[in-house]
Each structure stands twice: as structure tokens, then as C-alpha cells.
Amino acid sequence: MVDLRIPAALKLGPKLKRSFFARSVHEVAPDLIGATLLVEGSGGVIVEVEAYHHTDPAAHSFGGQTPRNAVMFGPPGVAYVYRSYGIHWCLNVVCEEAGSASAVLIRALVPTDGLALMRRRRGVEDERALCSGPGKLAQALGVTIAHNGLKLDAPPFALHGRLAAPEIVAGPRIGISKAAELPWRYGLRGSKFVSKPFAE
């Protein structure tokens, strides 16, 4: 069955290698729109992300390395997981060379695989509510601190690139008080699965 929620060009592409992440966070972030993220078989197509650079006051790494953010200072292509407001886990991908401490927050995806399990984890039926926000996404995919520092090109993760470049929109990031004006949130144009619509 054709999934009309996702352009055909965004169907499962080649597996992303570490070199994909060893680039500027501002290149990696929009390039992740349309990629497919699976965690032990559950997941879907990424439709919203945010970039965080080490020179960015909103980045966890801005004040220097701590036990909590140490993974950000490591090699690219690994998961950086933290708890937001002491409640929700959030999944990020570390970018650029080791020591640069930049990452992309995965904010939303279109659920395509393992929907029954994701619904049980989230306690909701509406597929648009399963992964439309970083906390929801991590809960749906079963991501916890146990995934912190794990390589994204090896189980339990599977991350595949898109087959063609989609239409991408950009705007200010959400829920931050510092550098809130920077247009470092990226999304798939017209997607109903993002956490908040983009102003166009």
C-alpha cells in the first residue's frame, strides 16, 4: 500500500554512515529531514529537527563539558540522550568532529513501523500524536538514557537516508529562551506530523 503521508522520494534509502554526521550541524540538520529512523524496528520518517552548535547559548555544550553532556564532545554519529525538565527523554545525534560538541535534536517523525508498540508506549491512538515532539518521539521509540552514547549505525538503531531532497522549511526553535530567534528548526513542508506548524 502506498503511504500518501510521505513523498515517494523519501522512502527508505541507504544506511547513513558516520561520515554523514562528521559535517557542520547546519548541513546535517536539514539533510535529516526525510531520513528514516528506527529503534529496534519502531520508528518512521523524520519530519522535524533542530540544530544546536557549540557556540549557541541554547546548546547544552555552550558552558563546557560536564558528565551530563560529555557525549556531545565525543565522536559524531552517536546518540545523545538527556532528560528534559526531569520528565521526558530527548534524542539527539552528535555532529561534526570530536570535541566540537554540536548536535541535532530529533523533534518529530511520521510513524511507519511498529505502530502498535508505539501506541502502547504512548497510550494514544492518533498516529499524529505519537511522535509529534521530542519527548513523545523518545517515549514512542522506547529511547532512554540507556541509549546515550550508542552508535547510530548499529543496533538498536537503524538510520537510513532519503532518496531525494524534499521541500524543507526553517524557522525559530521551540521552547528555548536563549538564541530563540535563530532559524535553526527544520521541517518537511506541509507535514501534519510536526510538533508545531511552521510560519510561512
Swiss-Prot record:
EC numbers: 3.2.2.-
Example GO molecular function: alkylbase DNA N-glycosylase activity
Xref: InterPro entries: Formyl_transferase-like_C_sf, MPG, MPG_sf
Keywords recorded for this protein, A-Z: DNA damage, DNA repair, Hydrolase
Pfam entry (one): Pur_DNA_glyco
The keyword Hydrolase belongs to this UniProt entry's keyword annotation: yes
GO biological process, one term: base-excision repair
Family: Belongs to the DNA glycosylase MPG family.
Protein name as catalogued: Putative 3-methyladenine DNA glycosylase
Species annotation: Rhodopseudomonas palustris (strain BisB18)
Lineage per the UniProt record: Bacteria, Pseudomonadati, Pseudomonadota, Alphaproteobacteria, Hyphomicrobiales
